Each structure stands twice: as C-alpha cells, then as structure tokens.
C-alpha cells in the first residue's frame, strides 16, 4: 500500500520553534511505523513562503520577501536532519516545480467546476490565525 504523509508546510515568517519540531517528529514516527508495516511511504515537508505574515516579517527585517525567505528556509531545511527525521522531499512554495504543480492543479479543478466564487461571513482572529465560529 502507498502511504503519503506531510507535515504542515511551515510559514517562513520566523525561525523554527518547538511546534515545528513536534509535528516533524510526529510525522516521522508515523512514516517509520508505516515502513515497518511494509507500506511504500512518501514523507514530505517544506515551507510556505507566501502570505501576509511572511511579507510583514520581511518588511520588519528590512529585506525583500524572497531574500527573507531564502535566509529563513535554511533553518527549516537544517531542522529535519537535526531532529533525526528521514524525509523523502522538502519543497518550498517559491520553487518552480511547486508553482507549476499548483497551476496544473488549479486548472484541473477549474476545468471540473471545483473552483467557484462565493461569499463568507464570520469572525477571524489575526492573533490566533483562525476563523471563529459564533455559538448559537
């Protein structure tokens, strides 16, 4: 059986912290367990180098966003062997292969009417970085 696992793709708005280590190790444990079961495992991790958080952090560091993420992504790349994790691939959202794959996926979804415009109403916490549901 094929088994695919990925960490969250980490934001490059700051250096790695204990949460990054926790999820990387947890995914590594699951990947290793599935290998022991005889599954064909593919373990991916990487960095999300887009978004307002990244842009704000770059501005605060007086760097261009691409220069900022290039410097920070190295910390995430180095985190994996430091933790003893065994991944199959590390991807950055600024890589050409990621951009190409994302565009191809978008086109497939669009062709199958899976992308549509809609309205959303609700509260969003910038501090918690989450949508908040109202209690009824």
Tell where the protein language model's regions lie, with residue ranges:
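N-terminal, positively charged nucleic-acid-binding surface of large information/translation enzymes
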Residues: 1-135
């Amino acid at each position: 059986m094929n088994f695919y696992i990925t960490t969250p793709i980490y934001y490059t708005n700051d250096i790695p912290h204990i949460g990054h280590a926790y999820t990387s190790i947890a995914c590594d444990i699951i990947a290793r367990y599935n290998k022991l079961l005889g599954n064909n495992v593919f373990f991916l991790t990487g960095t999300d180098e887009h978004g307002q958080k990244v842009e704000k952090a770059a501005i605060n560091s007086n760097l261009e966003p691409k220069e900022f993420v290039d410097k920070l992504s190295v910390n995430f790349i180095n985190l994996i062997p430091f933790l003893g994790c065994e991944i199959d691939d590390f991807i950055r959202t600024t890589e050409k292969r990621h951009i190409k794959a994302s565009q191809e996926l978008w086109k497939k979804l669009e062709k199958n009417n899976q992308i549509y415009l809609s309205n959303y109403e609700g509260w969003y916490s910038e501090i918690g970085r989450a949508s908040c549901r109202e209690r009824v």
